[in-house]
Amino acid sequence: MSVIAPPAPAEAAPAAGPARRPGTARIRFALTVIAVYVAAAVVGPVLLAYDPVATRTADRLLPPGSRTSDGGLAVFGTDQVGQDLLAQMLQGARVSIAVGVATLLLAGLIGVVVGVVAGYFGGFLDGLLMRLADVQLAFPSILLAIFIAALLGPSVVNVVIVLAVSNWVTFARVVRSQVLTVRGREFVDATRTLGAGTWHVVRRCVLPACVAPVLVVATVELGHVILAEAALSFLGLGTPASTPSWGVTIANGRNYLAEAWWIATIPGLALALLVVAFGVLGDALRDRFDPRLKSL
């Protein structure tokens, strides 16, 4: 008589730890790069002895690693008027990050309010707000920013206003889409049935569902805003020329690419790396929070 052996118990698949979660490596890389930039922007101008706007004609166009007339080290060299390039970049990073964060707070506030109102109440108000958003999307955001900046003039506050006006639509459309998905669910209907008011439903049921998509959009848009601020400053429509900015530094070095390539190249590379880091972080957070992408 043949004996049939019982089947061996199936081994349980190892649980996915933090390292297996989607985008973990990319998130760590991007956060490391961003943390270095933030630390340099906060601490660098305090520790560096050089004034970013002090001119030293005797030290003009020194290449990276040169010694200045007072014996100091110009790590990234100097520009056409002898200003230390590293000091300008550190101060410019502070300006760019501050402008980016302030712009996102203002644009995010406008976009979230518009998106919640349009998505939750719907009807005529929804159609009006979304048609306004469509009209703004018909114009390239950078051209709209240039037009408004030309009217307001160069100023840090004006740059924040210009970029916020140019970027609120993305937040509004994402939040509206999320609100339309959430407002018809059973737990929202149950909350209304129990007598909860509109503000209570929005605050306890709708807004928490919008946190993840808004975080993803904000991360990606922060890189776009920093790049747009540099573009406006490059054109003379952003921060004043007396305020160190990556865009101003790149603009000052564009006429010296043959003899002093470092003036425009080094800030340009630093700007590109920061924008890429925010883009990578945004993509990784999207993969982490979007359930439709977790199986890919």
Regions found by a protein language model. Name each.
Residues 16-24, 75-78, 86, 203, ...:
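A short amphipathic helical element positioned immediately N-terminal to and/or at the very start
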Residues 1-4, 294-296:
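Short, intrinsically disordered, low-complexity terminal/loop segments
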Residues 28, 32, 36-81, 237-240:
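Hydrophobic alpha-helical transmembrane segments of membrane transport/permease proteins
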Residues 2-54, 132, 210-211:
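N-terminal signal-anchor/first transmembrane alpha helix
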Residues 81-296:
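Alpha-helical transmembrane segments of integral membrane proteins
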